[in-house]
């Protein structure tokens, strides 16, 4: 269920941020910012539905998913596949996100 929230949130954030990248770094039209801003608003709204107990933890857990989605974006949209170090680093981040989300708080 969590993937149904965090994956669309990541796509919305990456799309929104990429619109600024495209405008500034790739010299695209400033009109790219209009859907980009809408995407960033969607991202912020989606994260408010996180099951985490507070915003900071929601963002921390989301960060692991964001890293995976960013690597997929780089691969599929920008034609730059991840190398083994990218994948190892992403795996560590997912483990960290899982610990933050699911480990008992009584320790």
Swiss-Prot record:
Q: Name one GO cellular component term.
A: plasma membrane
UniProtKB keywords = Cell inner membrane, Cell membrane, Membrane, Transmembrane, Transmembrane helix
Pfam families this protein is in? UPF0060
Highest taxon of source: Bacteria
Regarding the membrane, this protein is recorded as: Multi-pass membrane protein
- What InterPro entries does the entry give? UPF0060
**Residue ranges of the TM segments:** 4-24, 29-49, 55-75, 84-104
Location of this chain's protein in the cell: Cell inner membrane
- Per the record, the coiled-coil ranges are none
Query: Which PANTHER family has this protein been placed in?
Result: UPF0060 MEMBRANE PROTEIN YNFA
- Entry-linked NCBIfam families: PRK02237.1
HAMAP family noted in UniProt: UPF0060
Q: Which family does it belong to?
A: Belongs to the UPF0060 family.
The protein's name is UPF0060 membrane protein ZMO1566
The root-end lineage is:
Bacteria, Pseudomonadati, Pseudomonadota, Alphaproteobacteria, Sphingomonadales
């Amino acid at each position: 269920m969590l993937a149904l929230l965090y994956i669309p949130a990541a796509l919305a954030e990456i799309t929104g941020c990429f619109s600024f990248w495209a405008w500034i770094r790739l010299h695209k039209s400033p009109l790219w910012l209009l859907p980009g801003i809408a995407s960033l608003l969607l991202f912020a709204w989606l994260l408010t539905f996180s099951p985490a107990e507070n915003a900071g933890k929601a963002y921390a857990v989301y960060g692991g998913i964001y890293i995976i989605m960013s690597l997929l974006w780089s691969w599929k949209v920008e034609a730059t596949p991840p190398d083994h170090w990218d994948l190892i680093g992403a795996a560590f981040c997912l483990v960290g996100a899982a610990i933050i989300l699911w480990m008992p708080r009584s320790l």
